[in-house]
Amino acid sequence: MDDPLAQARAFFLAGLDAYEAGRLADADRQFTAALALAPGRPSVLTNLGAVRLKLGRHAEALALLREALAQEPDNAEALGHCAAALAERGEPTEALALFDRALALQPARAALWTLRGSVLNELGRGPEAAASFQQALEQGGDAELNAYYLAGLSRLPPPPGAPRHYVESLFDGYAHEFDAHLVQALRYDAPRRLTQRLARAGRRYRQALDLGCGTGLCGPFLRELAGSVTGIDLSRNMLDRAQALGAYATLLQADVTEYLAAAPEGFDLVIAADVFIYVGALEQVFRHVSRVLPPGGTFCFSLEESQDGAELALRSSLRYAHSEGYVRRLALDNGLHLDAIERAPVREEQRQPIPGLFMWLSKA
């Protein structure tokens, strides 16, 4: 095949196939090859920008999408992806303007109504956000996801947990910036706080299980406490970052509750730093952890503390908060003893501390 444009088309079609199959790295290679043979082609720029967006490479995505829009200002697909990239980079006002332009061109795009609602929620415009999520439902959008968003904006009983694909997508896109943003911008310190108390006790654990391990922020601390560390997370991109640390003997892509249901016994330390804010209801987690732990085993975790007395609440930030009484009840029901509790901010949100609970339990 000697015709450069024909070669570019072949790479482009292969990129579309890879993208649809979720093979993002392969899609990136194919679209990059197509762009080299057909520089400036808006369709290639748009799709490569979409891939880079999903890979968490937001600045690169934005540059590609803006180049596409310079040629096709009314490209609704490029507008939508560009808006999403701006939202990921913390520019919600600019993102909203592009979402509105895209939806004026293609009002039936349910996913854009959902993303628009998220941006409005971030801007503190709750009623408009709710209307956008409702419009997404009317256009045939993801029922579970939009109901979850709407629950965070209402006083309705919250769903039992965040949709799995929401969490996976959120952290896949966040992986490249996660550590710096969480630790530096949001003053996140849960891994150190949770493990510091264990280190002071001087106990050596055989096997530690890091639930929702993310990029591995707990890993270096756990490596000093345990002979072997296993990490579980939904996000493949997060696990790839954790793998590079070398702190984990095993890393598995799995839902926390589903993994615990089938997990082998023998973990004498189970830790969950800032994880239950997406798990929601914790009945199954406590039941399975109690089964996995041997007598004397340790279970420690951080929570956002519910401020209105509700055992379980879904906040407008779309994170769950839990009450101390809820945890005490679950501990009692599952043969776990509350050894220590500390109240301290779990992180900051819009430069305001988020009240948190840090809890250390042991199996009786």
Where are the predicted features?
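Helix-start (N-cap) detector for alpha-helical repeat units in TPR-like alpha-solenoids
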Residues: 8-9, 42-43, 76-77, 110-111, ...
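Class I SAM-dependent methyltransferase SAM/SAH-binding core
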Residues: 209, 214-259
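A conserved beta-strand element that flanks and buttresses the S-adenosyl-L-methionine
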Residues: 271
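Conserved beta-strand signature within the Rossmann-like core of class I S-adenosyl-L-methionine
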Residues: 296-304
